[in-house]
Design a protein with these regions (language model features):
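GH16 jelly-roll
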Residues: 1-157
C-alpha cells in the first residue's frame, strides 16, 4: 500500500509494439479505495502510448469535468518509435502543478491556475498509487492487428 504525494517520479521503460497494444504508466488517487469514484479521485498519466502511434508520447490529467476524451492532454512525437529503446518517463509534481518529462526534457506543464481548470477541482493534493500496465485492444488503442500475438512492456531497475 505505497502512495506518492509530490516529488519527482521517473520510470525507465520500453513500450510494447504492435497495433492494438496500449502501454501506460499512470497514477490514480488512493481515495478510490475509500469510495471516491473516478474521475473525482484524479488520474495522472505519466505516459500512454499505443502501437498504432509508435512515435507518440501522451501525458494527461483527469479530474472532475475533465476526464476521458476531455482530459488535459499534451501529445508530442518522438524521433523514433518508443518501442525501439528504453526511455525515461517522468513527472515533477507539487501542490500547484504537474510537469512531464521524456529523457530529462520537459514537454508539458499544467498548473491548477490553468485557464482550462477555472472553476474545476484539482484532486492532485493527496496520495496516489502507481499503475504500470499493458492492455491489448479497447477503445483507445483500437482494433488489434491479428499478427500481434505477443506484447511486452519492459522496465529496468
Amino acid at each position: 500500500d505505497i502512495g506518492f504525494k509530490y516529488g519527482y517520479l521517473e520510470i525507465r521503460a520500453k513500450v510494447s509494439e504492435g497495433v492494438g497494444s496500449w502501454s501506460a504508466l499512470w497514477l490514480l488517487g488512493k481515495n478510490l479505495a475509500d469510495g471516491v469514484t473516478w474521475p473525482a479521485c484524479g488520474e495522472i498519466d505519466i505516459l500512454e502510448n499505443t502501437g498504432s502511434h509508435p512515435f507518440q508520447i501522451q501525458g494527461t490529467i483527469h479530474g472532475p469535468d475533465y476526464s476521458g476524451e476531455n482530459g488535459l492532454t499534451k501529445i508530442i512525437q518522438a524521433q523514433k518509435p518508443l518501442s525501439e529503446d528504453f526511455n525515461n518517463y517522468a513527472i515533477s509534481w507539487n501542490e500547484n502543478s504537474i510537469e512531464w518529462f521524456i529523457n530529462g526534457v520537459s514537454y508539458n506543464k499544467i498548473s491548477k491556475t490553468d485557464p482550462a481548470l477555472v472553476g474545476k477541482d484539482w484532486p492532485f493534493n493527496q496520495e496516489f498509487y502507481l499503475i504500470i500496465n499493458l492492455a491489448i485492444g479497447g477503445w483507445f488503442p483500437g482494433e488489434v492487428d491479428p499478427e500481434l500475438v505477443q506484447a511486452e512492456l519492459q522496465g529496468t531497475g
